Amino acid sequence: MACHTGNRRFPSVEELSLGMAQMTLLGTPVSSGTFDSVETLADRMGELKINDKSKVAGLTSVWVASRYNPFQGGALFKSHLRCNSLKKIIYRTDRNKCVKTAKVYLDRGGPPQAEDWEKLFECAIGLLAKQDWGDSQFREETALRLVVAAGGGVKRDACSAGTGGTEEGDSDTEEEPLEKVMERATKRIIEETARLSKRRRPEALEAALELRDSFKILSAQGGPFSKLSKDEKTRWVTAFSKCLQPILDLNEGRLLYDYVKQVGSK
């Protein structure tokens, strides 16, 4: 698998858990049940019959992309209730050194190559410790290189998992109503804000709630999106796009934004 993201996007934990994306490590497909939640991921990864380096690569790739911080508050406490070998590897690293490594590569504009496992792993741990560091592109690139370093890959389903829409070439498939997509996506965005740092969380949650309220108001005023005039549809798309601007660093925020742009271009 190529190491660059291009127009790819590292799948969210929700997409992986629903089987809308598939991760392989050392050529071994990872069951979708492994990704039931970010919090239980280490325990489930620990059950795989592959070496610890590959397990840790898969674990940290999802944690990095999800902006999960295993060193913080309740996450740290819960982790030590069942501190398996993967967690021990992560918690025994020199976190200060990892944070410095992450800063170096953030300043350079890209993560270490997959071949440089030591620096790549340090960079990933630094990003876990500094939850608000790095934009989505940098984190997704880091996540992809971690999986590549483990001799694996991540393949997304043809369906756009977060939206229910389809890719080019699937025009015969009935498109899911925008209302259902928005309802599901706004719920996921609000859930994702709960995993953000204390500093980032209030602003992101405010934007997510504004998006939800905007959707409710427009739905009550205009009826089904599919029945609206072109001008009304444009008004909806503009309103949603504006609400999403402050949360484009969230996986689900970016996914919904791309979907809204796609709808607006039709």
From Swiss-Prot:
Record region (Disordered): 158-177
Name by which UniProt lists this protein: Probable matrix protein
Claim: ATP-binding is one of the keywords in the record: no
Compartments where found: Virion
Keyword entries, A-Z: Virion
Organism lineage: Viruses, Riboviria, Orthornavirae, Negarnaviricota, Polyploviricotina
One Gene Ontology CC term in the entry: virion component
Chief site of localization: virion
Protein task: May play a role in virion budding and release by binding the ribonucleocapsid and the host membrane.
Acidic residues bias spans: 167-177
Organism for this UniProt entry: Quaranfil virus (isolate QrfV/Tick/Afghanistan/EG_T_377/1968)
Highest taxon, organism lineage: Viruses
